[in-house]
From Swiss-Prot:
Its EC number is 2.1.2.1. The record marks H225 as: Plays an important role in substrate specificity. Gene3D superfamilies: Aspartate Aminotransferase, domain 1, Type I PLP-dependent aspartate aminotransferase-like (Major domain). This is Serine hydroxymethyltransferase. It catalyses: (6R)-5,10-methylene-5,6,7,8-tetrahydrofolate + glycine + H2O = (6S)-5,6,7,8-tetrahydrofolate + L-serine. It comes from Geobacter sulfurreducens (strain ATCC 51573 / DSM 12127 / PCA). It holds the Pfam family SHMT. It is an enzyme of class 2 (transferase). CDD domains: SHMT (cd00378). The keyword Cytoplasm applies. PROSITE patterns: SHMT.
Amino acid sequence: MSILETFDPQVAEAIRHETERQEYNLELIASENFVSEAVLEAQGSVMTNKYAEGYPGKRYYGGCHHVDVVENLAIERAKELFGADHANVQPHSGSQANMAVYFSVLKPGDTILGMNLSHGGHLTHGSPVNFSGRFFNVVPYGVSQETETIDFNEVERLALEHKPKMIVVGASAYPRTIDFAAFRIIADKVGAVIMVDMAHIAGLVAAGLHPSPVPYAEFVTTTTHKTLRGPRGGMILCREEYAKTLNSNIFPGIQGGPLMHVIAAKAVALKEALQPEFKAYQAQIVKNAKALADELVKRGFRLVSGGTDNHLMLVNLTGTELTGKVAEESLDKAGITVNKNTVPFETRSPFVTSGFRIGTPAATTHGLKEAEMADVAGFIAEALANVDNDAKLAEIKGRVNVLMKRFPLYAHRLS
């Protein structure tokens, strides 16, 4: 038995069950991924014990020379990977990364343009229930009703009318390529700075499969998980002129001591992202997403904007009796994990929704390829045709488990 199993069998059991879920179920939540053993080892290291307020070479505590090494590695690797002037790897999350950027250039009450949450944006892009919507005057933009892609005519009209100090670009549920150059043109017309939140597409950007926002934005934020396949955390890239202000808005502005074990894991993940095989992995994510989208359309599902250019797609259930909530719950019983999601021009509550979101990063990490996407689409279609039949859903789960056992990832942790 392990030390944890001996001392705290309840926690050990929960970890084991979660490992089994990740190993044998089909993980299709677009914002989730599975890290490598090297990342897990770094995050579970003694770096967790060290307080290191401040920045490398300028700490408020002694004994920081080793943690300085890993933070400097993470910074330099991030700059190399994305071609950025400056990187801050201390944010605990993507939300705190966004908060630090806002506080670097905005005052309470300033106007920002951000993507409407129900059109694919994120809570921190100005949702009224979030700090971003409470501190700032938010003008939301969205997608065209005809194409379900970003309506740049609307973005320009709103920018000219409201003269925002910042335009927030990026999304949590947008399946198409984002035209950063078009946003830059609009921002320059009104003297606005741009913050791009590339949390979902950072891995694709790193691999050259999505245009980079770095040349077009004063600030770029990201999480280090999702497509980047690192530990849960945040990161900020910015132009050199903003580096000092940005750093002070992370510490001491909104955070105290950084999580050095997580920063060590970020450094490892960023090294992985610099390897040639990472580009092949990201290409497979996109191939799988396109294959899965095609297979779902063949089976009669309607996808927001008709398909995908990246790692995710949104299934639109408007006009059917199904809700996103029922779809999520039914698929979970079938061993398939997705999340309910609002769709553009949503008519249902965000707790019910008219859609669900699917992403391929985690399944691709397991090793699934285009050939398996037909099976995955079949499982989804069959499960959603049997939402009231628990026995059938359990039978589908058995077949999902058989499929996933062909693609082991953490099986050695269960032996």
